[in-house]
Amino acid sequence: MRAIVPVAGVGSRLRPHTYTVPKVLINVAGKPIIGHIMDRLIEHGVDEATIVIGYLGEKIREYILKNYQIKVDFVEQEERLGLGHAIFLSRHTVSRDPILIILGDTIFDADLKRMMSSNHSVLGVHKVEDARRFGVAEITDGFIARLVEKPENPKSNLAVVGLYYIKQPQVLIDCLKELIKTNVRTKGEFQLTDALQMMIDKGEKMKTFDIQGWYDCGKPETLLETNRILLANAAPPTTRKGVLLQPPVFISPEAVVKNSVIGPNTTIAAGAEVENAIVRNSIISEDARVSDALLEDSIVGSNAVVRGSYKRINIGDSSELEFY
């Protein structure tokens, strides 16, 4: 089974962190977002992947090749022309066998094997209160009748959350080719939902699959919430002398923590150093330094330094804050 994972986006909603690191390499619950995605795909039988890279793509390539042994093809999306365009660029890696498509800012907890047992293409959906930020699926007689990308007035609360099982990928590629050839865009981009709608209009049957465990990593507040949810299912942390742990927490074995209170809902990544601090509901990234601080609901970037802070902060890589 092959999965296509588009990760070419800039991740502007996660600034300042994404000035120096691609969104999918931001650490959450002990590993980068893309690491959680790859682990789940492999667990469910995916043995080939196409990673669509763009912004800071070499860093993503380096991480994948270092940590995963499955067959991986990298495709570069030089112009950000939409999700549909990203999938179309992957066409040479696609055979006639079914494929999975999963967006790179979505961590999921779903029974993919059950999803892929369908005789039809399947789109993962999640019921939301406000569907205007999403593609929306409208259902008739158990099948998807209409897909609308970020509608002003949604007629359904079934948000398409970025997990797709495509039974006939060559039909999808043909529809994407037609969209691009005729320059059909929605909100300025070639949308995957428009190609899927074209497939439906041509007679393709598609069903929905309820994704209960869907964790958005696209904004600081949702990233921290995802960190909290994933940590709740993590193994208990190893106790450390002089450190009070309030689970759930993740502390890398390569992190140094002294005379501090850590947790709940806190990740401290490899190489980080935390001393004389209280840190809760936060993510401390690789090689960051935190001392004499009380941090809550905060994200500290890689190689950043925070001293004397009693605040909620969101500080990017290689930055320094001192409050004395």
Region spans (language model):
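Conserved N-terminal catalytic core of the sugar/cofactor nucleotidyltransferase
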Residues: R2-V5, R13, N27, K31-L103, ...
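Active-site metal-binding loops of divalent metal-dependent hydrolases
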Residues: V10, D105-T106
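A structural signal for short hydrophobic beta-strand segments in well-ordered beta-sheet cores
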Residues: L25, A137-I139, T208
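Left-handed beta-helix
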Residues: E178-Y324
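Short N-terminal binding/cap micro-motifs at the start of the first secondary-structure element
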Residues: G11-P16, R132
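Short internal beta-strands
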Residues: T50-G54, V125, I283, I299
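Conserved core of the sugar-phosphate nucleotidyltransferase
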Residues: I107-N183
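Short alpha-helical oligomerization interface
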Residues: T20-V24
